[in-house]
């Protein structure tokens, strides 16, 4: 096979190997994202949405890859032969860049594994790994051959040995896509949720805080002297550094450990500000120390699993920046939900997705 040919793999297989947030936005539109943002701001889990996106992409990509194997078997090229062809192409660098992800899957690798296991070198270590893989497939498949026997796919007889090459390749493809999806959705959802949250609370987004700015404003993903925060709210010479993490029970202390290093005073827009800290996490475990840890640094931690979490954020911002608490007169959950729903109509979601 000629892996220097951009058309040697199905177009959809190459396209699904890497997608962008713009691809997701174009596919679903802002109305879908508005519903998701509303759900998150009212206590639902964002992963209910992103997991479906991931599984859809996985199914489309896995089936396209599987179909590729079937087509090649019809041409008389076995999965094991494809494995060896891909190995040689990677070793000799005889491929175009766009084909690299699929070639790595064909040798049961991901880009991250290529970095970590092979140290980005397709040399002797790669040869040893390929030989050992072939030996292990032959050894392990013997224990299942009598039970499974010969497999028929698309009218093609497939030995269990060849089927092992297919499923290992699909496994690597799955690892790549799950890692890609986690990174993709995590990055833009942080900005989308925080941007929407602070906009409905009356703060204006600024790419950078300028000197002399007196309005209620916020920035996203700021970094100063290696102390990074996901957002910074500023007003009246005071500021709140915000860290958000879509991480589960047991890992939330990681977020607080990071933000606890922020200074109590910091220069923002050429002016020294009193700094407070707020951590937004997905859920707080029953035995988590994070609430007490936050209090020790005069900070606040809220969990997005709490239907009232937006009201708690509003109250904390009001107390620290001396601004109106827009939800103070809305103790009922239905009133909070109604406020959020109405306010989201005026939020430019596309702006925050594309940041």
UniProtKB/Swiss-Prot annotation:
What top-level class of enzyme does the UniProt entry assign?
hydrolase
Extract the InterPro entries matched here: Restrct_endonuc_II_CfrBI (IPR019042)
- The superkingdom listed in its UniProt entry is Bacteria
Please give the biological process terms from Gene Ontology that the record holds.
DNA restriction-modification system
EC id: 3.1.21.4
GO MF terms held by the record = type II site-specific deoxyribonuclease activity
The reply on keyword Hydrolase is yes
Question: What is this enzyme's catalytic activity, as reactions?
Answer: Endonucleolytic cleavage of DNA to give specific double-stranded fragments with terminal 5'-phosphates
Q: What happens when the gene is disrupted?
A: Loss of restriction enzyme activity.
Keywords assigned by UniProt?
Endonuclease, Hydrolase, Nuclease, Plasmid, Restriction system
> What is the official name of this protein in its record?
Type II restriction enzyme CfrBI
Organism source for this protein?
A: Citrobacter freundii
